[in-house]
Amino acid sequence: MPEQSKAWIDDTTLRVMTYKSGPFIFQLGFELNQVQALLDRVNDSQNRFNKMPSLPLIIDQVQDKVLASSIYSTNTIEGGQFTEQETADILKQDPKTIQKSEEKRLTNLKESIEWVKKSSSKQLAPLSGKAFELSAMFQLHTLVSQNLAEQHNPAGQLRSNRPGQKTVVGNEAHGGIYRPPKCVEDIKYLIQAWVEWLNSPHIISQPAIVRACLAHYYFELIHPFWDGNGRTGRLIEMFILEQSGYRFSSSAIWKYYQTNIHEYFALFNQCRKQAARKEDNPNQMFIEFVLKGMFATIEYLHDQSNTLIHFLLYQTALNDAKFSRKISDRQFNLIHNLMRAIGENSKFLSKADLYRIPQIQALYSGKVERTFYRDIEKLIELDFLSEQDGLLIVGN
């Protein structure tokens, strides 16, 4: 049996020889100058997002939306069947009352994300990495896997395949099948080498996004646990991003992975095969994929936050108009009933459709129909409503 050994080929490349799994190489495997422009755009967008007004109402709503979306996405990637709305509803429940393993997976992910956020930095530091401790990996897998009816996946315990027992990752539809290391001695040795590589001087000083996504990539290749590797790997990526100030986008990117799931899975195999063939820059495509995802994600967060800010300003103006008697209580309630109806029906309404709603009928009880239409006209005149293609729009 070959002896285990490690050797640094250069400042950023660590070659590991295992007992039974052959050689394993940790490397950057990309050209920075080919992604620098996109990396700069990502960091500029994140920096602007971090500097947005920290209004509690805005932050809380963004946080709730990102939490539900992130957990829905990472759970769906692993085969979860809940919708995003069902996920959001389950997350609002007391975890102590939840009995089903499928639902516990969601609350476990919520607890994991909350634990990661304890290490979050408010200041963006894209080139200032912090050490990643092996204990964090075990803690994240424990949080992800705790209290589930899965005896085959002990929380925080490394995988150790019995003789003849196979572990297969992936499928032909997503770029092929991969068989990760099986021997627990090899898995332990590789995980220790992975952390050594991550924390080495020339890797920890790499752009945080690059370091984070490569931490995720190599963790998945080692595949150290029986189950929960995907969820844990994405949380590790999130942890490293949060350490460097990539707030909210660190987990919101999971939506991008889920939306582009075929490319996400296929790139793991494609990069692995390119490395095996000793091609130049085998990790380039995965890094570019993550950078594109980060940029799209942060721009989406900007849009969501701007929408919430505009809504907050709208509500303030509406309250001021009511207080100064520019609009009546009935007109104020008309707008709120319209907003509720739009939210419940997920579509805009015409004036006639709105008038038929029971809440509006109750609001105008004892009034002639013309009063309703006069109120609508007044609210349009004051720019609290607008009309496009016969449909009522909140705002102008």
What are these regions, as identified by a protein language model?
Residues 1-396:
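FIC/Doc superfamily catalytic core
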